[in-house]
Swiss-Prot record:
The lineage of its organism: Eukaryota, Fungi, Dikarya, Ascomycota, Saccharomycotina. Residues 250-449 form the Helicase ATP-binding domain. One of its GO terms (cellular component) is nucleolus. This is ATP-dependent RNA helicase MAK5. It comes from Lodderomyces elongisporus (strain ATCC 11503 / CBS 2605 / JCM 1781 / NBRC 1676 / NRRL YB-4239) (Yeast). The keyword ATP-binding applies. ATP binds at A263, T264, T265, G266, S267, G268, K269, T270.
Length: 855
C-alpha cells in the first residue's frame, strides 16, 4: 500500500514497516511490564512473625560420599526466614514469596487477590501512556481518513493479537499458580515427612518367601519365629548363618523372657537383641496404625542403653540396615546421645519413634525436663543394656538407676494393653566379680550363695562369676520381670575370642616408641593403638606422622564432631594406604565395630582385665582373624602382666583343680634387632620434634590462661606471680621448656629425618649385591614378594609370622629372665643418675669459686 504525507509526497514502504515494527515492539514491552511487580506491590507484602513449629523444616539429604558429614545427624534447614532478637527471645520473621513458602499452614489467597488488583491498575496506567505515544506517532501519518482508519484497524488487530497472547500469559499465570499450589502441598508434605516417616511404610507388602533362602537360620526353628521382612534384610546383608549367641537368645527373647547374654567380642550381640525388638514392633502394626489414625503418639517398642555415643550411633546404623525392608523406616529408629542438639532430639521423640538408642546422661536430662515424655517412654515393651558391665559402673549406674525409677513410677498399672513390667535384655562380653562388687558395696564382704554352696575367697580367682551369682547381683538392680531370667553363655571357655592371636613384645619402658614403629613398619595394615592417657595419645599422633605413617587420634577430650571425623578419616586412609593407625584411649575400647582392623597394639598395659578383653575385641570381628600385641616392660611383666594373664587364662581351665598355664596363649613376637638398630635414629628425631610441638602448645595455652586470669583480677605485673607458684609446677614448666626447639633447630632435625627416611632399611646391613645373602633380593623383586621398606626382606604378615616363628613364653620360675633385664636397666639408670649428680656438684663448686673471686 502506498501512503502519502501532508505535502503530497509518497511515504516509502520501508518507513511504514519500520513504524509497525516499533509499535509491535512497544506492545511487547508493555506486556512484559505487566508481569513485573511494581513498588506498590512490593510494599504491600508485609513481614509476618510466625512460631518455630509453623515453619516448614526440610531434612537435609546428605550424599553417601560425604560419610557422616562432619558429625551432623538429622540436620534440617529453612529458607526465607529471618531471626530477630526481641527482649532476649528469638522471633522468626517471614518475608516475601520464599518466606511464605517456608510457613507450613500459610494461606496466601488474599495476597494473590491484592496482587491482581495492583496488576489491573498498572495495566490502565500503561495503556494511557501507550495512547499518548501513539498520538505522537500519528503526526507522521498522512491525513487521508480512510487510510488512517485502515492503519488504526490494522493497529487494533495487532493489539488484539498481542492481547490474545497476553490471555495466553494469563493462562500460564494460572498454571504457575497451580504449580505454586502443588509446591505448597509438597512443602506441607515435607513438613509432615519427619513426623510420619516412621509410619509411611506400614502398608508395605510382605516379601516373597520363595526368594528368601536362609537354611541355616531354620535349623533351630528361628526362621519360623521371624517375619519375612527381617529375613529379607538378613538375606540382603549376607547374614546367612546365625552366631551361637543369636541362636540361643533370639527364641528366648521372642517368647518375652528376660535374658542375660554373654559372648565374646564381635559375635553379633547387636542383632541378638535388635531382631526381637524389630519383630515385636512388626507384631504391633495394627495398634500402631490405629493410633496413627487417631493422631495419638505411639510409645516406643524398645529402648536400648549404650555406654558411649559412638556405640549408640553404631547400633542405629546396624538396625537401620536390617530394617530397610520392614515397615519401620529410618526415622523410626532414633539416637539420643550427648554432643548433639537437644532440641532436635526432643522434636524427634515427640513423633513417637519405634526404637530409641540412648546414653544414660542425655536420656535422664530429657526425662527430667518433660513429664509427658517420661509417661510415654515408661510404656516401652523392652529395655536393653548393651555392654552392661560398663553401663553399670563408673557413675553410669546412678543415672541409669534414676531412669528406671522414673519409668517404674510412671508406668500405667491398670492398662490391660501394656504388661505390668517391661522385658529386660542384658548383653556383655565380660561379667567379673570385681566389677559387680562395685554395684553393691554392702555385699563386698559377704558371700553370695550359689547352687546351695557358699562362695569363699579361694574361688575369687576365677574371671567369671557363677551363673546364680550373676543373676542374684543383677536382679536387685535391674528388677527383672521373671523370677529366674535366662542366662546364656555362648562361650563358657573363652574370655578372649579364639580368632585373636595374642602376642608380646619385650622392651624397655623408654623404648615403646621404637618397637611400635618397628611393628607398624614391618607389618602393613590397619592398626588400632591403645594408650592409657590422653597425653600419650596426643604425643603418638605427631610422632607417627613425622615418620610418614598416617595416624589419627580419638579420646574423651575431643568433641563428638572431632571423634566422628577422626573415625571417618581413619576408614578412608585404611582403604587408600597399606598402613593406617588410629591412636585411641579407652573411649574406643568398647562396642565400636570399625571394619578391617588387622592389629590391636597395647602401647600401655590396660588397668583392668575387662578393658584388655574389650580392647582386643576390636579386631577379629565377624569370624575374621586378628592380632593383639602388648608392649611390655620388665617392671610390668613381673606384676600386672602376670595378674592379667592369670585372670584371662583361668577361665580356659576345664575344672578348678586343673593347673593354670599363665602364658599358654601368648607368643613372643619375633624381632630382628639389626633392623631395630637402624630405626632408632629415626624414632629419636621424630620424638624430639613431637615433644617440642607438644611443649610449645602447652606453654602457649598456659600463658594465654595466665594472661586472661590476670586481666580479670586486674594484675598488671605478671612477674610477681612466679613467687607464689609451687615448686612442682616450676619443675614441670622447666621440663617443658627444655624440650622446646627454636625454628632453626626444628628445620635442621626435620632435614635430618627426611634424609633418614629417604634411605631404605637394609636387612643384615647388605649394601652392594642384590643376590648376596640368604635372601635373593632380585628373585623377590621379580616375584613381587619383597618388602617395600626393608631391602632384602620379603613381605610378612603378623598373623603368619606369629604362627611360623612366634615362640611361646616359657614361664621360668620366679621370672629370672625378666628380673635380670630389670636389674640391668636399674644399673644403667643408676649410672646415669650418678653422672648427673657429679655434674651438678662440679657446677656448684665452680659457681662457688667464681663468687669468692668476685668478692
Amino acid at each position: 500500500m502506498v501512503k502519502t504525507v501532508a505535502n503530497g509526497k509518497k511515504k516509502p514502504q520501508k518507513v511504514v514497516k519500520k513504524q509497525q515494527k516499533t509499535q509491535k515492539k512497544h506492545n511487547q514491552q508493555k506486556l512484559q511490564k505487566r508481569n513485573t511487580p511494581t513498588l506498590k506491590q512490593k510494599l504491600k507484602k508485609e513481614s509476618k512473625i510466625v512460631k518455630i513449629n509453623e515453619l516448614a523444616w526440610k531434612p537435609v539429604e546428605i550424599p553417601d560420599n560425604f560419610g557422616d558429614f562432619g558429625g551432623f545427624y538429622g540436620l534440617e534447614e529453612i529458607d526465607g526466614v529471618d531471626v530477630e532478637m526481641v527482649d532476649g527471645k528469638p522471633q522468626f520473621v517471614v518475608k516475601g514469596e520464599e518466606g511464605e513458602k517456608s510457613v507450613s499452614n500459610e494461606n496466601t489467597t488474599t495476597n494473590e487477590l491484592e496482587d491482581g488488583d495492583d496488576i489491573e491498575v498498572d495495566e490502565g496506567e500503561e495503556i494511557a501512556q501507550q495512547e499518548q505515544e501513539n498520538s505522537d506517532n500519528d503526526e507522521l501519518i498522512e491525513e487521508d481518513a480512510e487510510e488512517v482508519e485502515e492503519q488504526q484497524q490494522h493497529g487494533e488487530k495487532e493489539l488484539e493479537e498481542e492481547e490474545f497472547t497476553g490471555f495466553g500469559d494469563d493462562i500460564a499465570k494460572e498454571e504457575k499458580d497451580s504449580d505454586g499450589a502443588k509446591k505448597k502441598l509438597n512443602s506441607s508434605e515435607d513438613i509432615d515427612e519427619l513426623k510420619y516417616n516412621a509410619f509411611a511404610n506400614l502398608d508395605l507388602p510382605l516379601p516373597n518367601d520363595d526368594e528368601i533362602d536362609l537354611p541355616e537360620w531354620g535349623e533351630d526353628k528361628i526362621e519360623t519365629c521371624l517375619s519375612p521382612y527381617i529375613l529379607n534384610g538378613l538375606s540382603n546383608m549376607k547374614f546367612t548363618t546365625p552366631t551361637p549367641i543369636q541362636k540361643r537368645t533370639i527364641p528366648l527373647a521372642l517368647e518375652g523372657k528376660d535374658v542375660i547374654g554373654k559372648a565374646t567380642t564381635g559375635s553379633g550381640k547387636t542383632l541378638a537383641y535388635g531382631i526381637p525388638i524389630l519383630e515385636k514392633y512388626i507384631q504391633s502394626l495394627d495398634t500402631v496404625k490405629r493410633k496413627v489414625r487417631e493422631k495419638v503418639v505411639n510409645h516406643p517398642t524398645g529402648i536400648i542403653f549404650a555406654p558411649t555415643r559412638e556405640l549408640a550411633h553404631q547400633v542405629v546404623d546396624h538396625l537401620n540396615k536390617i530394617a530397610q525392608y520392614s515397615p519401620l523406616s529410618t526415622k523410626g529408629i532414633v539416637s539420643v546421645t550427648g554432643g548433639l542438639s537437644i532440641q532436635k532430639q526432643e522434636r524427634l521423640l515427640s513423633f513417637g519413634p519405634g526404637i530409641i538408642v540412648a546414653t544414660p546422661g542425655r536420656m535422664l536430662e530429657l526425662c527430667q525436663n518433660d513429664q509427658e515424655l517420661v509417661k510415654r517412654l515408661s510404656m516401652t515393651d523392652i529395655i536393653v543394656l548393651d555392654e552392661a558391665d560398663r553401663l553399670l559402673q563408673d557413675g553410669h549406674f546412678e543415672e541409669f538407676e534414676k531412669i528406671l525409677e522414673l519409668f517404674n513410677k510412671n508406668r500405667p498399672k491398670n492398662d490391660k494393653s501394656i504388661e505390668w513390667k517391661w522385658q529386660t535384655l542384658v548383653f556383655s562380653a565380660t561379667f567379673s566379680r570385681d566389677l559387680f562388687g562395685k554395684l553393691d558395696k554392702q555385699q563386698k564382704q559377704k558371700s553370695v550363695k550359689g547352687n546351695g554352696k557358699a562362695l569363699n575367697k579361694a574361688d575369687s580367682g576365677n574371671s567369671l562369676v557363677q551363673n546364680d551369682e550373676i543373676i542374684e547381683l543383677l536382679r536387685e538392680k535391674l528388677r527383672f520381670k521373671d523370677k529366674a531370667p535366662s542366662l546364656v553363655d555362648a562361650n563358657p571357655k573363652e574370655i578372649v575370642s579364639g580368632q585373636i592371636t595374642e602376642a608380646l613384645v619385650e622392651c624397655g619402658p623408654l623404648e615403646r616408641d621404637l618397637y611400635l614403629y618397628y611393628f607398624l613398619l614391618m607389618y602393613k595394615g590397619s592398626t588400632l593403638v591403645f594408650a592409657n592417657s590422653i597425653d600419650s595419645v596426643k604425643r603418638l599422633v605427631p610422632l607417627l606422622n613425622n615418620l610418614n605413617i598416617p595416624a589419627f587420634a580419638i579420646h574423651s577430650s575431643m568433641i563428638q564432631k572431632q571423634r566422628l571425623r577422626s573415625l571417618e578419616r581413619f576408614k578412608d586412609a585404611s582403604e587408600k594406604n597399606q598402613t593406617a593407625v588410629l591412636v585411641a584411649s579407652d573411649v574406643a575400647a568398647r562396642g565400636l565395630d570399625i571394619p578391617n582392623i588387622d592389629h590391636v597394639a597395647h602401647y600401655h598395659l590396660p588397668r583392668s582385665a575387662d578393658v584388655y578383653i574389650h580392647r582386643s575385641g576390636r579386631t577379629a570381628r565377624a569370624g575374621k582373624e586378628g592380632v593383639s600385641v602388648m608392649f611390655c616392660s620388665p617392671q610390668e611383666a613381673s606384676g600386672p602382666l602376670r595378674k592379667l594373664r592369670k585372670l584371662v587364662a583361668s577361665n580356659a581351665a576345664n575344672n578348678k583343680n586343673q593347673k593354670i598355664n599363665v602364658h599358654s596363649d601368648v607368643k613372643l613376637l619375633p624381632v630382628e634387632m639389626d633392623l631395630v638398630s637402624q630405626l632408632r635414629p629415626r624414632v629419636e628425631l621424630a620424638g624430639r620434634l613431637a615433644d617440642s610441638n607438644i611443649s610449645s602448645t602447652a606453654t602457649r595455652k598456659e600463658n594465654s590462661w595466665v594472661k586472661q586470669a590476670a586481666e580479670e583480677l586486674g594484675v598488671e605485673d605478671l612477674h610477681d606471680l612466679d613467687e607464689f607458684e609451687d615448686d612442682i609446677i616450676k619443675k614441670q614448666r622447666k621440663r617443658q621448656e627444655s624440650k622446646r626447639l627454636d625454628k632453626n633447630e626444628q628445620k635442621r632435625l626435620r632435614f635430618e629425618l627426611r634424609e633418614l627416611l629417604a634411605n631404605p632399611i637394609r636387612k643384615n646391613n647388605r649394601r652392594s649385591y642384590l643376590t648376596s645373602g640368604l635372601q635373593n633380593l632380585a628373585h623377590l623383586m621379580v616375584q613381587g614378594t619383597h618388602h617395600e621398606d626393608v631391602l632384602g626382606h620379603e613381605k610378612v604378615k603378623a598373623l603368619k609370622d606369629l604362627q611360623k616363628n612366634g615362640s611361646k613364653i616359657k614361664p621360668v620360675k620366679g621370672d629370672d629372665k625378666m628380673k635380670r633385664i630389670a636389674k640391668v636397666n636399674q644399673r644403667k639408670q643408676a649410672k646415669k643418675d650418678a653422672k648427673k649428680d657429679a655434674k651438678q656438684k662440679r657446677q656448684e663448686l665452680r659457681h662457688g669459686h667464681s663468687n669468692k673471686s668476685e668478692e
